[in-house]
Amino acid sequence: MGSFSMWHWLIVLVIVLLLFGRGKIPELMGDVAKGIKSFKKGMTDEDAPDTAKTVDHKADETK
């Protein structure tokens, strides 16, 4: 009862193929890849301005 055997995975694969068809699965995987790529780009875009915000502060001379 604990783990899936090879037959379980084959049955799941057949059901997925019947539901989505052969043409739809690559399309779905492409959409997932685009989403991951967009997420990574968004994460690096947020980090980039933080490193660019360096301010040089000059010390005031008082006598």
UniProtKB/Swiss-Prot annotation:
Transmembrane listed as a keyword: yes
Ranges where the record places region Disordered: 42-63
InterPro entries recorded: TatA/B/E (IPR003369), TatA/E (IPR006312)
Gene Ontology biological process terms, A to Z: protein transport by the Tat complex
Compartments where found: Cell inner membrane
Pfam family, one: TatA_B_E
Annotated GO MF terms: protein transmembrane transporter activity
Transmembrane segments: 1-21
Superkingdom of this protein's organism: Bacteria
Bilayer topology term: Single-pass membrane protein
Biased composition (Basic and acidic residues): 53-63
Keyword Nucleotidyltransferase: no
Keywords noted in UniProt: Cell inner membrane, Cell membrane, Membrane, Protein transport, Translocation, Transmembrane, Transmembrane helix, Transport
Cellular compartments per GO CC: TAT protein transport complex
UniProt-listed NCBIfam families: PRK00720.1, tatAE
Its biological purpose: Part of the twin-arginine translocation (Tat) system that transports large folded proteins containing a characteristic twin-arginine motif in their signal peptide across membranes. TatA could form the protein-conducting channel of the Tat system.
HAMAP family: TatA_E
The protein's assembly and partners: The Tat system comprises two distinct complexes: a TatABC complex, containing multiple copies of TatA, TatB and TatC subunits, and a separate TatA complex, containing only TatA subunits. Substrates initially bind to the TatABC complex, which probably triggers association of the separate TatA complex to form the active translocon.
Homology family: Belongs to the TatA/E family.
Official protein name in the record: Sec-independent protein translocase protein TatA
Organism encoding this protein: Rhizobium leguminosarum bv. trifolii (strain WSM2304)
UniProt gene name: tatA
